[in-house]
Amino acid sequence: GESTRPGAEPVPVAEEIRRVVPVIEALAVEGALISIDSRRAEVMRAAVNAGARIINDVSALSGAGALEAAADLGVPVILMHMQGEPGTMQDNPSYGDVVAEVRDGLLARAQACREAGIAAKDIALDPGIGFGKTVAHNLALLAHLDSLTATGHPVVLGVSRKSYIARIDRDVPPGERVAGSVATALAAWDQGVRLFRVHDVAEHRQALAVY
C-alpha cells in the first residue's frame, strides 16, 4: 500500500488501507498466507482483520502504536532494520560497524516485542539490505548473516533484483539481476537463512532444491 523504496513519498493512512484491504480479502478467500508490509498501526489492524497473518514492518515496529497493535493482533512479525526514513535513507548512510549495529538494533527491537507480549518464536529478523546502506554495507551484512541466524530468530532476506547487484555488474537493469539474486540466496542458505522475499519464485525454488 505504501512504497518504501529509496526516495519514496509517504502515503496517507486511509489511502494505504484502501489499497491493501480489498486485495487481502480476495487472497484470503483463496487460502493464501498473507503478510502485510506496513509501518502504520491502523493499517496493520485493518489488514489482519481482513485476513493477513503476518506483519512485516521496515521500521521494526518503532512507529506510533505499531508495537502495541502487533501484540494485540497476536500474529508473527518480521522486524526489518532501516537507518533513517525511506525518502532520505540513501542520502548518506553511516555506521561504525554495520554488522554489529544492525544485529544489536534488531535484537533491541526483538526484546521490546517480547516485553510487549509477542512470543520469541513469532519474531523474525531482516537486515534490511538496501535500506539506509551503501553497497559496502550490504556486502558486509551478506557476508555475516550468521550473526543474525545465531540469535535463534528466523532470518528473512530480501535481496531480489536489488541495486547492489547492478553496482557490481555493469549497472544491469532489474530484469537482468536474477542470477545475482539467486547467487545471494544460495550464499545466505549456507549461513542458515531459510526465508526469502523474491520476485522470481521458480528460479529461486529450483536453485535451492538442487543446491
Residue ranges and their predicted role:
Residues 4-33, 39-42, 48-49, 53-112, ...:
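Active-site-adjacent loop and "lid" segments of alpha/beta metabolic enzymes
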